[in-house]
């Protein structure tokens, strides 16, 4: 029977690669030097990248230079359109990662700065190196295992455990993602749990020598560029993917808490209740929404929002649910911030 490289398996197996030969040093995957994919295979990656769904009517760009695939967009004088294009370019970047993973290839973003780099009439947001890679896991290039064993996965109290394998082939669906789908079933609690994991869930690879693997790439191994919120039944929750144990009562440790919490916690999958809200008017009438926000005013945070949107659009394909999506405008951002959601950027509406 032919192996299915399912959406969930690809999300769980995605990782960055390098040449150092040590998966626990910097990046998890290992490139095979000078082993370039065939033009036919590379065209399949580019096809997924070119099919990125767009909120804007701007021009996304891709080009090759010195063996790197550059991604970006044509400049515009409209600040909101530029914001949209940064999000969409993040979706492009993630499309490259997912396509490479599904095809058994390795890739890594060699960054162009936290806000991108100007190239004449374009803004370049990333440059990807794409090569063949060695097996990333004991079972080969794919894994359906949870994080562990060094930092074992801790089941959350409020969400069902995510599936890390499925029956829907990833690559064909990656070529036909959309911003909305009017047909399909209403998302239930299991679907919501799966979407949260797809957005920013924990996976079994290492990042910067730590078991911090995620379904999305992170610049420099950073863990807190963005937040994920859930709105359901007029309640606001924050998605939690790492248990945090603060050293209470020891003020001298306070300045180290944000570093120590990653070292002493564990990967998890849960939501934390925050407050009651009444914000469906700002969510186009939706009663359930997954809201993506940024914790810093950089473009890398917008790209990360794009990664999460790309993953959730893909995950809906195997769930068979209806959904819409949106990027918030200034008035909506202010209203949502008054309801406890800091710097909201975009949402999946269910």
Language-model region placement:
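Short pre-catalytic strand/loop immediately N-terminal to key active-site residues, enriched for Gly-Thr
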Residues: 80-88, 298-307
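Mixed-charge, glycine-accented linear interaction segment located at domain edges/termini
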Residues: 291, 308-311, 316-318, 327
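Short hydrophobic alpha-helices that are characteristic scaffold elements of the AMP-binding
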Residues: 98-102, 317
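C-terminal edge-of-domain segments
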Residues: 121-140, 345-350
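N-terminal amphipathic, basic helical "cap/leader" segment at the start of enzyme domains
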Residues: 1-80, 112-123, 137-288, 299, ...
């Amino acid at each position: 029977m032919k192996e299915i490289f399912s959406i969930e398996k690809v999300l769980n197996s995605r990782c960055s690669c390098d040449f150092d030969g040590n998966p626990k040093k910097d990046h998890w995957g290992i490139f095979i030097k000078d082993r370039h994919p065939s033009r036919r295979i590379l065209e399949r990656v580019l096809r997924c990248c070119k099919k990125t769904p767009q909120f804007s009517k701007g021009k996304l760009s891709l080009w090759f230079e010195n063996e790197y695939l550059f991604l970006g967009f044509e400049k515009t004088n409209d600040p909101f359109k530029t914001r949209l294009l940064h999000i969409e370019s993040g979706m492009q970047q993630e499309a490259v990662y997912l396509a490479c993973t599904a095809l058994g290839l390795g890739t890594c973003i060699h960054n162009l700065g936290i806000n991108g780099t100007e190239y004449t009439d374009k803004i370049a947001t990333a440059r990807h190196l794409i090569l063949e890679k060695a097996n990333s896991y004991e079972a080969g290039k794919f894994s359906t295992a949870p994080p562990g064993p060094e930092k074992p996965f801790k089941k959350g109290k409020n969400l069902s455990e995510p599936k890390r394998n499925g029956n829907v082939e990833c690559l064909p669906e990656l070529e036909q993602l959309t911003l909305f789908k009017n047909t399909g079933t209403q998302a239930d609690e299991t679907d919501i749990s799966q979407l949260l994991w797809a957005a920013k869930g924990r996976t079994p690879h290492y990042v910067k020598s730590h078991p911090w693997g995620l379904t999305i790439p992170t610049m420099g191994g950073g863990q807190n560029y963005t937040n994920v919120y859930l709105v359901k039944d007029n309640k606001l929750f924050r998605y939690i993917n790492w248990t945090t144990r603060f050293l209470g009562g020891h003020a001298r440790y306070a300045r180290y808490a944000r570093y120590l919490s990653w070292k002493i916690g564990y990967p998890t999958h849960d939501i934390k209740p925050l407050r009651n809200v009444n914000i469906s008017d700002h969510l186009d009438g939706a009663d359930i929404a997954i809201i993506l926000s940024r914790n810093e005013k950089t473009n890398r945070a917008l790209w990360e929002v794009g990664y999460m949107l790309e993953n959730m659009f893909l995950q809906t394909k195997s769930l068979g649910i209806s959904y819409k999506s949106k990027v918030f405008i200034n008035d909506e951002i202010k209203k949502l911030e008054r309801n406890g959601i800091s710097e909201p950027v975009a949402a999946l509406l269910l």
